[in-house]
């Protein structure tokens, strides 16, 4: 479909490192993709979003299942608040690796990032050599042909698109000060403006016709810069296919992988261009911040079971809340669209940039072990409970912090996120849970006759408090004889850990996938993913062969690669 561009068009060319070069030389000095004519065009209002029902999961995990009597679902305000944590419904794509959609370019299907929520703190860690000209920064420009010839293998540079306008203004990174002033950008937040800018940028095919393929973005909230990434790949591992710090030698690609860090890059936010399709939606639809003072839980048997009570939960020891946040993103069960197998030709030439669709490549739809919380156990040790169960209720714990794989480490709303209406204060985890006793009376769940407990949910100090209390006298007659040994665990409005008593919970927990007893997962936090068992999909995909000019024959060398932008940027 050809996009009808409205407004002034600007012809752009690939970035040049030297302004004095001749026209002939600059044709070879631009982005190596010059020959491919895969370029960008500003999207116009009639341009379809390209969200394909065949490639994007539309089926969300239902929050209302087994929620009879759940006060977090009965109250409209609370139900709306809890639904934002349903990443299957609101994000609809991979998180660790997001390649959730397929788009056709020149008769071939390619995969693109497609998630609808920003991924806070996500960055790509490069394993280039620790020597010039390598900088191990994925936000560096993609390499020019000249830069590659000077460095040799592995490739230098990073993933950033390096096109410029005739006036010399770079397309990426683009200053937020300019996006704020631009009438084409309607978003109300800095992050939304960057996402919208990415959504208005699409690839062109070899005939200079607009496609529907869009590129991911990274917003740097510290520098207020919007990066458009020309490389959609997010993970490449294995010494047969890529090198780590130059070993093994002579491989075209260096290895790289998505990361979140305990101490660094919290100001970077990775997202697909589709966050910008409705650039203000993420403010209320996505779990952008961590939730302080509560454990995620699932409503069953008339009470809220936090993740430590679910049989398929993974529990690991951590030294800090930040490590639990990292684990929520990097654990082996998190939603990922990474393909299952490596192509045999991945090192045949230096041309792997766009992910190529293959039949064995998964579309996770956002389903995965995307949820977790930090808590302190009865011995005083910090623990991280990880689950694939979408939370539909909360258990009070003043020492706990609940995380999602998409959200930030921050327990407050970042100051650069502003509401659509400036007169309205942006919601925080605290204000979102406010209640009044007259409108939120005490409610009780059904009696769990095994534990002889029922859940009491009430409004205390303007906050929802969920605690476990004894069943009524009549209900206690139906409880087992050992009730006294496992009851009475609610202290000061905080539900303690050992609701099932002792260590029997972990002794009985089974690994859902293998059907055998599961380990307690009490090992120390490991920052090196290579020391752990990789998920089956931790493999690369074949990518666009036409990025490098040598991959195509009979490439037209007349004229430059063009970028068309609606209006002035």
Swiss-Prot record:
It is found in: Cell membrane; Secreted. GO terms for cellular component: extracellular region; plasma membrane. InterPro entries: Apmem_Ag1. Residues 416-487 are annotated as: DIII. It comes from the Eukaryota. Residues 518-530 have a biased composition (Basic and acidic residues). Residues 1-48 form the signal peptide. Residues 67-287 are annotated as: DI. Residues 49-483 are extracellular. Its main location: membrane. Keywords: Cell membrane, Disulfide bond, Glycoprotein, Membrane, Secreted, Signal, Tachyzoite, Transmembrane, Transmembrane helix. Residues 518-548 are annotated as: Disordered. It is a single-pass type I membrane protein. Disruption phenotype: Severely compromises the parasite in its ability to invade host cells. Inhibits secretion of the rhoptries, organelles whose discharge is coupled to active host cell penetration. Residues 49-66 form a propeptide. Disulfide bonds join 117-286, 194-226, 242-255, 304-393, 324-384, 435-459, 447-471, 452-479. The chain crosses the membrane at residues 484-504. Proteolytically cleaved during invasion within its transmembrane domain, releasing a soluble form from the tachyzoite surface. The cytosolic tail generated by ROM4 cleavage during invasion may trigger parasite replication within the parasitophorous vacuole. Component of the moving junction (MJ) complex, composed of AMA1, a transmembrane protein on the parasite surface, and a complex of the rhoptry neck proteins RON2, RON4, RON5 and RON8 localized to the cytoplasmic face of the host plasma membrane. Interacts (via ectodomain) with RON2 (via C-terminus); RON2 serves as the receptor for AMA1 on the host plasma membrane. AMA1 and the RON proteins are initially in distinct compartments within the parasite, namely the micronemes and the rhoptries, and interaction happens only upon initiation of invasion when the micronemes and rhoptries discharge. This is Apical membrane antigen 1. It comes from Toxoplasma gondii (strain ATCC 50861 / VEG). The lineage of its organism: Eukaryota, Sar, Alveolata, Apicomplexa, Conoidasida.
């Amino acid at each position: 479909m050809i996009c009808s561009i409205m407004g002034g068009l600007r012809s752009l060319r690939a970035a040049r490192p030297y302004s004095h070069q001749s026209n002939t030389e600059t044709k070879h000095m631009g982005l190596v993709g010059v020959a491919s004519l895969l370029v960008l065009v500003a999207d116009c209002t009639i341009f379809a979003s390209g969200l394909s029902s065949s490639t994007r999961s539309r089926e969300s995990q239902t929050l209302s299942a087994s929620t009879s009597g759940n006060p977090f679902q009965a109250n409209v305000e609370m139900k709306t608040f809890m639904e934002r944590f349903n990443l299957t419904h609101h994000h609809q794509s991979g998180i660790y690796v997001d390649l959730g959609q397929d788009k056709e370019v020149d008769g071939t299907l390619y995969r693109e990032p497609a998630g609808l929520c920003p991924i806070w703190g996500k960055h790509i860690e490069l394993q280039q050599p620790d020597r010039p000209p390598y900088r191990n920064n994925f936000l560096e420009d993609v390499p020019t042909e000249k830069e590659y010839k000077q460095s040799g293998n592995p490739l230098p540079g990073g993933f950033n698109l390096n096109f410029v306008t005739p006036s010399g203004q770079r397309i990426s990174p683009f200053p937020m000060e300019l996006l704020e002033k631009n009438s084409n950008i309607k978003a109300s937040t800095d992050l939304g403006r960057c996402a919208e800018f990415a959504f208005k940028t699409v690839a062109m095919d070899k005939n200079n016709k607009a496609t529907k393929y869009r590129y991911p973005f990274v917003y740097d909230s510290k520098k207020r810069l919007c990066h458009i990434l020309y490389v959609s790949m997010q993970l490449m591992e294995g010494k047969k296919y890529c090198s780590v710090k130059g070993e093994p030698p002579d491989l075209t690609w260096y290895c790289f992988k998505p990361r979140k860090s305990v101490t660094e890059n919290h100001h970077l936010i990775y997202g697909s261009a589709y966050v910008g399709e409705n650039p203000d939606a993420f403010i209320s639809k996505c779990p952008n911040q961590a939730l302080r003072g509560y454990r995620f839980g699932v409503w069953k048997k008339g009470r809220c079971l936090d993740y430590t009570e679910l049989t398929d939960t993974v529990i690991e020891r951590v030294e800090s809340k930040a490590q639990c946040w990292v684990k929520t993103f990097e654990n082996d069960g998190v939603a990922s669209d990474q393909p299952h197998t490596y192509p045999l030709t991945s090192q045949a030439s230096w041309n792997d940039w766009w992910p190529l669709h293959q039949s064995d490549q998964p579309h996770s739809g956002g389903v995965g072990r995307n949820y977790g919380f930090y808590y302190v156990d009865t011995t005083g040790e910090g623990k991280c409970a990880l689950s694939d169960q979408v939370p539909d209720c909360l258990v009070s714990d003043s020492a706990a912090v609940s995380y999602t794989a998409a959200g930030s480490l921050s327990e407050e709303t970042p100051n650069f996120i502003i509401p659509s209406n400036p007169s309205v204060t942006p919601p925080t985890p605290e204000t979102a849970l406010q209640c009044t006793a007259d409108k939120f009376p005490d409610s009780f769940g059904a009696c769990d006759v095994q534990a002889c407990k029922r859940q009491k949910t009430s409004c205390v100090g303007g906050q929802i408090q969920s605690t476990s209390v004894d069943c009524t006298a009549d209900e206690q007659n139906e409880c087992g004889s050992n009730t006294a040994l496992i009851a009475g665990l609610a202290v000061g409005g905080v539900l303690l850990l050992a609701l099932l008593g002792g260590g029997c919970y972990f002794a009985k927990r089974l690994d859902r996938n293998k059907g055998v007893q599961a380990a307690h997962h009490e090992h120390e936090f490991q920052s090196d993913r290579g020391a752990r068992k990789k998920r089956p999909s931790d493999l690369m995909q074949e990518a666009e062969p036409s990025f490098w000019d040598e991959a195509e024959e009979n490439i037209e060398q007349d004229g430059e690669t063009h970028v068309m932008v609606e209006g002035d940027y």
